[in-house]
């Protein structure tokens, strides 16, 4: 019965130009244009998912569907790709808005700072200013979420969930010690290798490889993320990853303190990107905060097998807030 309900949940795919970059947005629910919807039935709140790196929004569809269902299908759940991590298929129209057409191009939009500005640009041009927001950041998406709150404190955010948050000491983490030399010093070798191996590869073979991989990982392929094997997208993910290792160093305690009442941190016990000691440190510094340690051994990449569990946790935490909407 539960699987049947999930199949009925509408998910609308759009490719838009945001800050000058092609961007995939997956919209869960019947609402596709909140900005121009003036009807009385327009929802008062948007749940907005910001992915980790690579920022393939298609990976988050099962999670978005589960969350949409658990919130009684009353609120849209949207997931945005990172700039440069998704390219529209040749037969897909790229939508633009007059605001985005006139907007200043974001400097280094594929880098750490550019990705933050990219998300803010999307909210400015596609979400009404008076619409309440629930932000869900996963991995480096948690860092983006904190930075968005810091840069635009007037955003009408009622809650922000930081899942397996890579918000500090990334290069010192177990995975960071491996990734740093690869992403910061050897990435040009990776770029060249990727282009030589993947660029000549026919689309049919890429599609077959991706679909097989998704089956192994038990991920839905409703929106097949061909960009996984697109050299341009992989290069942008590596570029972002290199900046993460170098720049995500010190935890932004000032921003955390300012917005603590609306923040929920969710750390893993087996997370090589943000080990348990990071949880212990932030818990000690902010004992009054909603800072949780996973008790279910859910891995950093929860979207592979644990979408329902994470959606359950968030929906349960939101009950009181959503009842007031």
From Swiss-Prot:
Domain of life: Eukaryota
Catalytic activity, as annotated: a cholesterol ester + H2O = cholesterol + a fatty acid + H(+)
This enzyme's EC code(s): 3.1.1.13
Subcellular location: Lipid droplet; Endoplasmic reticulum
PROSITE patterns: LIPASE_SER (PS00120)
GO BP term, example: lipid storage
Residues at the catalytic site: 139, 271, 300
Single GO MF descriptor: sterol ester esterase activity
Record function comment: Probable serine lipid hydrolase associated with lipid droplets. Has low cholesterol esterase activity. Appears to lack triglyceride lipase activity. Involved in cholesterol and triglyceride homeostasis; stimulates cellular triglyceride accumulation and cellular cholesterol release. Acts antagonistically with PNPLA2/ATGL in regulation of cellular lipid stores. May regulate triglyceride accumulation indirectly through stimulation of PNPLA2/ATGL ubiquitination and proteasomal degradation. Promotes microtubule-dependent lipid droplet fusion.
Family classification: Belongs to the AB hydrolase superfamily. LDAH family.
Listed name of the protein: Lipid droplet-associated hydrolase
Organism: Pongo abelii (Sumatran orangutan)
GN (gene name): LDAH
């Amino acid at each position: 019965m539960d699987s049947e309900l999930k199949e009925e949940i509408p998910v609308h795919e759009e490719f838009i130009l945001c800050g000058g970059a092609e961007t995939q947005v997956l919209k869960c629910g019947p609402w596709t244009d909140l900005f121009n919807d003036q009807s009385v039935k327009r929802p008062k709140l948007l749940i907005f998912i910001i992915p980790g790196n690579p920022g393939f929004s298609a990976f988050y569809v099962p999670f978005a569907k589960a969350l949409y269902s658990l919130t009684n299908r009353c609120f849209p759940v949207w997931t945005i790709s990172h700039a440069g991590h998704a390219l529209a298929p040749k037969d897909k129209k790229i939508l633009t808005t007059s605001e985005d057409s006139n907007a200043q191009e974001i400097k280094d939009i594929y880098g750490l700072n550019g990705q933050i500005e990219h998300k803010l640009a999307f909210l400015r041009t596609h979400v009404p200013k008076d619409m309440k927001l629930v932000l869900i950041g996963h991995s480096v998406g948690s860092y983006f979420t904190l930075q968005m709150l810091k840069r635009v404190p007037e955003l009408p955010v009622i809650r922000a969930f930081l899942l397996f948050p890579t918000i500090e000491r990334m290069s010192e983490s177990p995975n960071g010690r491996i990734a740093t030399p690869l992403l910061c010093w050897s990435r040009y070798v990776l770029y060249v290798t990727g282009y030589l191996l993947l660029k000549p590869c026919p689309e049919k073979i890429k599609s077959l490889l991706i679909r097989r991989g998704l089956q192994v990982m038990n991920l839905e392929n409703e929106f097949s993320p061909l960009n996984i094997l697109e050299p341009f997208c992989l290069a942008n993910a590596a570029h972002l990853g290199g900046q993460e290792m170098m720049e995500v160093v010190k935890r932004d305690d000032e921003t955390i303190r300012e917005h603590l009442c609306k923040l929920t941190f969710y750390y893993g016990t087996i997370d090589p990107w943000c080990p348990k000691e990071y949880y212990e440190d932030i818990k000690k510094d902010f004992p009054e905060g909603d800072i949780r340690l996973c008790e279910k051994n859910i891995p950093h990449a929860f979207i592979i097998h644990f979408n329902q569990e994470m959606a359950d946790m968030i929906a349960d935490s939101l009950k009181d807030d959503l009842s007031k909407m």
